[in-house]
Amino acid sequence: MILYIAEKASVGRALADVLPGERHREENCIRCGGDVVAWASGHLLELCEPEDYDTKYKAWRLEDLPILPDSWKLREIDRTKKLLHSIRSLLKNASEVVHAGDADREGQLLIDEILEYCGWKGPTKRLRLNDLTPEAIRTALKNMKDNADYAGEYRLTRSEERRVGKECRSRWSPYH
């Protein structure tokens, strides 16, 4: 089974509309013949908070800065756990994944992060959609590349996410 993972439901539905086979809508996916289209809803994972690494970081102290974990941890976002668990379950039966995140660095990060978190090691292709018309989707399906070709985008965006700066949305910033 090929598992297509879109960044959002609207893209998943547009993609399912052009795939061959009879369509069966389920709660968090659409089955198209023998394949499945699933979707995220923005980020399904977030960086763990400093206190998740060590309770001493629960209160900000200048002498503890910078906080640089040996390895960064992710955690599931409560409001999207159901989607993540659905994707994880579908991955168990997948022979291949088609990464259909948005055609930008954040879209690359979003789906790659899910695949890494779920332990997916199988073949993965990258579907870059710039338009959701049926013709544009069919063209993009014919021109997919190996997802490994976009590993640099994933690593760059992941490293930017881990920097502490003005746009930090968590307790990683003392200014939040």
Q: What label would you give each PLM region?
A:
Residues 165-176:
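Positively charged, low-complexity/disordered segments
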Residues 1-161:
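Intrinsically disordered, low-complexity regulatory segments
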